[in-house]
Swiss-Prot record:
GO terms for cellular component: cytoplasm; cytosol; endomembrane system; GABA-ergic synapse; nuclear speck; nucleus; plasma membrane; postsynaptic specialization. This is E3 ubiquitin-protein ligase RNF34. Residues 115-134, 273-287 form the SAP domain. It comes from Rattus norvegicus (Rat). A zinc finger (RING-type) spans 334-369. Its main location: membrane.
Amino acid sequence: MKAGATSMWASCCGLLNEVMGTGAVRGQQAGFPGSTGPFRFTPSSDFPTYPPAATEGPNIVCKACGLSFSVFRKKHVCCDCKKDFCSLCSVSQENLRRCSTCHLLQETAFQRPQLMRLKVKDLRQYLLLRNVPTDTCREKEDLVDLVLCHRGLGSGDGLDSRSLSSSRSQTSSFFTQSYFSNYTPPSATVSSFQGELMDREGTFRSEVLTQVQSELASANTDDEDGEEDDDDDDDDDDEDDDEQEENLEEQNPGLSKKKARASLSDLSSLEEVEGMSVRQLKEILARNFVNYSGCCEKWELVEKVNRLYKENEENQKSYGERMQLQDEEDDSLCRICMDAVIDCVLLECGHMVTCTKCGKRMSECPICRQYVVRAVHVFKS
């Protein structure tokens, strides 16, 4: 009896162990959580069942395109505005990364004429990257003024302060190296790198300014060469006249200031045209919109000026005759309608100032304000 009871108890314990073992294994598998199965197991605090979920950081995106950074879209920091941009929205120049907006304005060298040629969108974006409000700007000139006031806000002021600190760190590193040759402070290397950045930026601006100045100088020299070529084609007499004029200007410096450019109204007769210099003849033709590009000799210019003078005299005469005819016609027109001829006498005053049609409508004379009794039509013989 006892042996049968013990064997039954052992079989029950073995069955219990098998059930508990399978439950424990199922509880540890990933597909079967701890709450499923015949037995529930409470996980201890020291050994959690599942690994904690990874906390995701803030999603940083590109300031220009708004896309998140990845392996193929690397993040770069603009050296001017200190904002994050991707590789497609930034430009690499001299080992420096700038965003497209800062690079566009950097190319203008912050000159007002060049900034006025840019789009309003680029100017506004440049100011927004530096946290400068643009709500009060109504015109493009306001944006340009703000850009000139706040240029280099993100990098210029910082670079100025860093340059001071770099100079101090360099001096300190010099003294420390003299006493401690084995120790090289890292601040000296950082300051030297910042100094190189400042030098590169200064050289870039100076190169732009020198290029603009050289272009202006070359343009001025081209103009002077063109004028010299034109003067070489003149005769010796013209050179003598120019020398005489220069001598007069040297003797009387106030005369050159008072002397104006030659005009057609200064001529009183055709004989004066022969005594004028080539430069004066060209000035007269240019002021009257006459082309003289094909003229190689002085006599050709003289002929053009003579023809211009004659045409001007004829135009003045014809204009005077037309004005006289117009005055006569105006004298014979009705003073009320200015359309019909005066052919009416107003009685009792006897004034003739209107046509018959207007005289019948008048209640009083427009000259003497006398009451009109009758308007009589008059025929001119």
